From Swiss-Prot:
This is T-cell surface glycoprotein CD8 beta-2 chain. GO terms for biological process: adaptive immune response; regulation of immune response. It is found in: Cell membrane. GO terms for molecular function: coreceptor activity; MHC class I protein binding. The lineage of its organism: Eukaryota, Metazoa, Chordata, Craniata, Vertebrata. It comes from Homo sapiens (Human). The gene is CD8B2. Residues 192-210 are cytoplasmic.
Length: 210
């Protein structure tokens, strides 16, 4: 029986959505057109004959929504794709307990909710789903505004002003000149007295030797 027909029959059975047995990551992803996407589904139970289905729901979950079969990974038969699936754009592989759905060159029409599923007896167990949004342009993130740093003011000591004009006042100059004159007069008086004393001594010596 074809997987698509089998799924239509299995959909009439009890369905368990969002079970913790299958953990899907990420919960939401937005990518740009023609990029690659990897969706992960980790099984928390050990099955002897592991078989993981990947389904897509193009519209929001409702009573009228249906699941589109994409591909399955069977431990015995390998990978089986759906009838209307572009096989060159989709691949599924196993990494330990994780099952990876790899989508390449995605388009906006590939947007939807992707579910992984395992078949029990009689119920179907779904993961919580990964919502994929494919857009032509990703929103640009605003650059964080830089905080304006206040510059610290450096307190500078005032420079001593250079004094223009004469360094000394007229009074000071007058005192200096008067001091110089007094010194000159004193020196002259001292020299005069010294000369007189010398002459007096010479006279005394002459009178003594006569």
């Amino acid at each position: 029986m074809r997987p698509r027909l089998w799924l239509l029959l299995a959909a009439q059975l009890t369905v368990l959505h969002g079970n913790s047995v299958l953990q899907q990551t990420p919960a939401y992803i937005k990518v740009q057109t023609n990029k690659m996407v990897m969706l992960s589904c980790e099984a928390k139970i050990s099955l002897s004959n592991m078989c993981i289905y990947w389904l897509r729901q193009r519209q929001a979950p409702s009573s009228d929504s249906h699941h589109e079969f994409l591909t399955l990974w069977d431990s015995a038969k390998g990978t089986i794709h759906g009838e209307e699936v572009e096989q060159e754009k989709i691949a599924v592989f196993r990494d330990a307990s994780r099952f990876i759905l790899n989508l390449t060159s995605v388009k906006p029409e590939d947007s939807g909710i992707y579910f992984c599923m395992i078949v029990g007896s009689p119920e179907l167990t779904f993961g919580k789903g990964t919502q994929l949004s494919v857009v032509d342009f990703l929103p640009t993130t605003a650059q964080p505004t830089k905080k304006s740093t206040l510059k610290k003011r450096v307190c500078r000591l005032p420079r001593p002003e250079t004094q223009k004009g004469p360094l000394c006042s007229p009074v000071t100059l007058g005192l200096l000149v008067a001091g110089v004159l007094v010194l000159l007069v004193s020196l002259g008086v001292a020299m005069h007295l010294c000369c007189r004393r010398r002459r007096a001594r010479l006279r005394f010596m002459k009178q003594f030797y006569k």
